[in-house]
Amino acid sequence: MKKIIFFFLTFSLLAACDDFLEESPPTGLTSDKLNDLVTMRALNNGAYKNFREFYAYATTIPSLAIGDSFMLPNDGAGNYIQATTWTTTGFSQVLTGNMYTSAMSAFHNVNYIINADLTNMAGTENEKNAVLGDAHLIKAILNFTVDKFFTRNASGNSFPLLNTVVGPNEKVSLSTSIALRAQAETDIELARQYLKQSAGVNTYMAATAFAAKIYFFHKNYDLAYELANEVINSGQFSLESDMSNIYLNGDTSTETILTIVTDLTDTTPSNWGGYATVNFDRFEASKSTGLFTLNPYSLVAQLRNADPSDLRFTQLFEEKDGFVFMASKYPTNETDQIIVRLPEMYLTRAESNIMNSNSVTSTDVADINVVKNRAGAADTITGTPSASAMLDIIYNERSKELCFELFDRLLNSVRLEKDIVDQNGSTYSYGDYINKLYYPFPQEEIDYHNFEE
C-alpha cells in the first residue's frame, strides 16, 4: 500500500498497547511483554491513529490565521475566534492542545519501536524493515510538523526533541528548530532506507515524496528537486481529470501519494472523527450550519476572480447564499486526509530547480503547465519567463492548487516571507506575523516541565 492508513482495529492488543503508552501500564501488559513484531505493528497502528487528532485542526486554524477563510457566526465559532485575533494576542492555548498531546502519544509509540531490540524478535528481515520504515516515517512527519507550528522565531526554541520513551513522571525540556529539522531529515532517510527494502503500511515512494516536502521547506532545494523528480519519474501516479474525484477517492485516487485513511466503522469510545469530522462540518456549504467560507480579501479569492473558469474553483468551490464555500475538498465525514499528491511534486520540482539555478528551463515551464492544463487554467505559460516572474507564477499556482489542504498556504507564505491578510483584509508583513503565528504549549505542560520559551 502507498499511503499512511489508520487501522482502527478492534482487536484487544492494539487497544491495550495504545492505552499503555498514553496512560499507565494496564495489568498484565508491561514492557517485558512488548517484545514481538505483532506488538510493534500494533504500536505503529496506535501512532497512525494519533494522526487523526494531530491533524484534526491543521487545515481550519491555519486557513483562518492566513486570512484564506472567513468565519461565519455559527455553532462552533467560539474557539476559532482565537485564530483570528493573533494580531494582538497571538494564538491561544485552547487551539493547540490537540496537536501537542497527540504528538506526544505518537512519539511515545514510535520511539518504543525504534529503541526496541527487533534483531532478536522472531520474524524476517523484510518484516522488521517494514515496521521500522513505518515508525521512522511517522516520526519524520511529526518532527517536521511540530517544528513548523511550535518554533518561536525569536529564540529558536521549539517542541521537545523526543528520541526515547518518556516515563510517566519524567520531565522533558524544549528543543530547537535546528535540532528538530535535523531529526526529521535523519528519520525520513531511515524511512526511505527501510521501506525500499520492504513496504509496510507505507511505501518507499510515499516516504520519498514526504522527503521532498521536508527538504523543500528546509530550503535544501537540491535534494527537494532530486526527490520530487524521482517520484514523478516513477510513473506510479497520474493526475485525475475530474478534480472532485481526488477528494472523493482519497487513498485510491491516482494522484495521491501519501494519505491518512480513516475508517469510522470502529465504534470504540476513543474513535472520534478527527480531521474528517472537523473538516466536513466546518467547510460544509451551508450558511446556517457551515463555518468557513472563502475570505473575499484573500489571495485565493483574488486568483479565483482572475480566472473563474479554473476547474479548481468551478469543481471544488460553490457559491451559495452570497458566500463561497470550499466543501468539495471534504465531501464526507470519512474523507481521507491527503498529505502529498502529484501536483505538489511538479510544483516542487520546478521551483527547486529555479531556486538552485536562478534561471528557468523548458522543463520548469512544462511542469507548471501540466498542473495548469489539468485545471483548464486560462493563464498557461508561453515562452520562458524570467526567474523572478516564474517564481511569482509558481507561488500563485501552489496557492490555487493546495489551498485548504493541511497547512501548505501558511508554511509556504512563511518560507517566502510573503504578506498575509486578516479577516478584514488588513495586510501583515512577514515581520508583523512571524513572532506571533506559533502554537503555545498547554499551560499544564509549561508548569510541569518548567518550559522556558
Predicted segments — roles?
Residues 17-63, 379, 418-453:
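Membrane-proximal, proline-rich intrinsically disordered regions
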Residues 28-32, 58-77, 152, 156-160, ...:
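Short, surface-exposed recognition loops and adjoining beta-strand edges that mediate ligand/DNA contacts
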Residues 44, 107-110, 114, 181, ...:
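Inward-facing hydrophobic residues that define packing positions of alpha-helical scaffold repeats
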Residues 78-149, 189-198, 332-342, 352-355, ...:
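Conserved, well-structured interaction surfaces
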Residues 181, 221, 359-361:
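TPR-repeat structural position
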Residues 230-359, 367, 416-453:
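Elongated scaffold/linker segments in the mid-to-C-terminal portions of large proteins
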